[in-house]
């Protein structure tokens, strides 16, 4: 009986809680479907303001963040986190549809962001980056 309980606890410990903040519904569906398939918990929001509130009130293992969103964009979210809880920055994987300069990537790294990936995102690469944020 204790083996079953132990296995369940191991599964719970390996299950990641991921927040996806992106206004592109096609991308969020693809990422969340994949994460659900491999038994990770996934919260999806399409607005930066809502995502920022969730970051402030919940604990996530990893945060996938789009930079270009209407109203509250990824840059504003990064700035708020930097000022309010910089330890959260190491959990963030930035997604961007535009070409990101080497200088911007360097600035993200200096800020403490885990990674920056360009869309269309390679799901295996994203999963690897998500797992890196928890290690």
Question: Residue ranges of each PLM-predicted region?
Answer:
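Non-catalytic signal-transmission and effector/linker regions of two-component phosphorelay proteins
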Residues: 1-17, 124-135
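Two-component/phosphorelay signaling modules centered on CheY-like receiver
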Residues: 25-43, 111
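Helix N-cap/capping motif at the beta->alpha junctions
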Residues: 44-53, 74
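Short amphipathic alpha-helix used as the core "switch/output" element in two-component signaling
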Residues: 53, 75-88
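Active-site residues of response regulator receiver
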Residues: 66
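Receiver (REC) domain active-site loop signature in two-component systems and cognate sites
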Residues: 69
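Alpha4 helix (beta4-alpha4-beta5 surface) of REC/receiver domains from two-component response regulators
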Residues: 76, 99-115
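Hydrophobic/aromatic residues positioned on beta-strands within the core alpha/beta folds
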Residues: 95-96
């Amino acid at each position: 009986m204790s083996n079953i309980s132990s296995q369940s606890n191991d599964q719970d410990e390996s299950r990641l809680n991921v927040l996806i903040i992106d206004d592109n519904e096609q991308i969020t569906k693809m990422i969340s479907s994949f994460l659900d398939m491999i038994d990770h918990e996934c919260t999806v929001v399409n607005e930066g303001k809502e995502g920022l509130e969730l970051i402030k009130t919940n604990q996530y293992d990893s945060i996938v963040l789009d930079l270009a969103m209407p109203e509250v964009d990824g840059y504003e979210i990064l700035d708020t986190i930097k000022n309010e809880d910089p330890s959260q920055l190491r959990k963030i994987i930035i997604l961007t549809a535009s070409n990101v300069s080497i200088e911007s990537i360097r600035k993200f790294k200096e800020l403490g962001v885990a990674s920056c990936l360009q869309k269309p995102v390679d799901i295996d690469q994203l999963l690897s980056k998500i797992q890196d944020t928890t290690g």
